[in-house]
Amino acid sequence: MSAIFEILDKDAGGRIGKLRTPHGVVETPTVMPVINPNIQLISPKEMRSFGAEILITNSYIIYRKEELRTVALEKGLHELLGFDGPIMTDSGSFQLSVYGSVEVTNEEILGFQEKIGSDIIVPLDIPTPPDVHFRRAEEELATTAERLEAARKFIQSKQLLAGPVQGSTYPELREKAASHLKDLNFEVYPLGAVVPLMESYRYAELVDVIAASKKGLSPTSPVHLFGAGHPMMFALAVALGCDLFDSAAYALYAKDGRYITSNGTYHLEKLNYLPCSCPVCSRYTAEELRKAKNKEELLGRHNLYATFAEIRLIKQSIKDGKLLELVEQRCRAHPKLLDGLKRLYTHSAWLEQFDPATKGTYFYCGPESASRPEVLRFGKRLERFSIEGSAIIRTSPVKGEKDYDRILTFKAPFGTFPAEMEEVYPFNAEVPKFPDYEALSTSLSNTIKLMDLNPGAEFTFICEKEFQHPLIEEIGKKAKLVYREAWKKE
């Protein structure tokens, strides 16, 4: 594990950790509010009251403005912003992505960040946007790699150095870049050029980008999802292993009259009620907030409260082993997020290696739950069950079951397991009485696999009338199939 990053708790790919910086320890996952040195809707010194432990600002903006540059060089970045905690600085890559060029070299901006006392320094990488030609992505990635290698040699202080992972929307390039950077031993790994994906709600592709990058990195490396600032997607990103986010959304949305919640965004002009109990929403009605002279500031404050409330809920969900339940709730807030959830579970085999072997009770939240890592793990371990003689499979106790050599329980979405394990994780799962098609598909497939692994056993399967699924016919070829109603009459 990295000397500067300690993992305390885990669930799925998410983790609670401690990131050590020159200006203190930060608990992750967390959000870094973006501070514009020229325009401060809410002062940096107030950020701690919302829950902020670390800020991020743009060193290129400071570098370009003589007044700011002079103060930063003479008194330091922390004095300039009036914040005594950790501060990360971006290098100007955002301006490069927007305007196509910046008036500074990689070495110049690295040296400037080092001199002003940034806690996390970011090199001037090339933010390759989505959907470009593969050759362009590959060429720009090579340029970024050269700059990052130079940065690693250039920065020798105790300040942390970030190694941004680029590669556009090509998972193979993302994983290749991450693997290369891992060998250079950066302290923090931002995932760059993902804002266009989030702005266009391309969450399925975002999931692939994050997963590919994470697969190339050490599992103990802290990961920063650059430009991710809306709380509705934090849980999804955390479940993939992201530890740091940065948010200018609190201010940008406030300027546009938008009200952030963990389930999406409202336009203040259309709100009759404020669905929040933060200090702002507890004091004002929707109408009063609209008429307030400092409406933008108040809205920005609410947006920050909502942002950090979601971070706290995510941390508690990790503690409780309920992160994926939260992810499934959040991803039903928007169809595109649901696409992201479905894509997340295509990576379940990878996630399963990080998911704790035992944790809080599994809750079935919908069809996607049938693809969770816990279910996949069960399917991989069916060979551990050795069954001989007569065996009865049922969802709940039936008359005459003790006449059989083995009593087995069927529970979707898992499948069939020894009845004596019903109260053991994950079989103590809370599931619907009537399983959906996806849950039946997985559980019946696992049951067929169990039967195939134990060809010497004689199975009797007590089927519920609600089990309408093509695989029931296959079960009937391998076991005596009896519907519960018919069993009662025997």
UniProtKB/Swiss-Prot annotation:
A single cellular component GO annotation: cytoplasm
Chain sites annotated for binding substrate: 125, 193
Cofactor note (record): Binds 1 zinc ion per subunit.
Superkingdom field: Archaea
EC number of the protein: 2.4.2.48
Positions of Zn(2+) binding: 276, 278, 281
Taxon lineage: Archaea, Methanobacteriati, Methanobacteriota, Stenosarchaea group, Methanomicrobia
General function of this protein: Exchanges the guanine residue with 7-cyano-7-deazaguanine (preQ0) at position 15 in the dihydrouridine loop (D-loop) of archaeal tRNAs.
Pathway: tRNA modification; archaeosine-tRNA biosynthesis
Family: Belongs to the archaeosine tRNA-ribosyltransferase family.
CC cofactor: Zn(2+)
Active-site residues, Swiss-Prot/TrEMBL: 90
Catalysed reactions, as listed in the record: guanosine(15) in tRNA + 7-cyano-7-deazaguanine = 7-cyano-7-carbaguanosine(15) in tRNA + guanine
Protein name (database record): tRNA-guanine(15) transglycosylase
Entry keywords, A to Z: Glycosyltransferase, Metal-binding, Transferase, tRNA processing, Zinc
Cross-referenced Pfam families: TGT (PF01702)
GO MF term (any one): pentosyltransferase activity
Enzyme class, UniProt record, top EC level: transferase
GO biological process: tRNA wobble guanine modification
Record carries keyword NADP: no
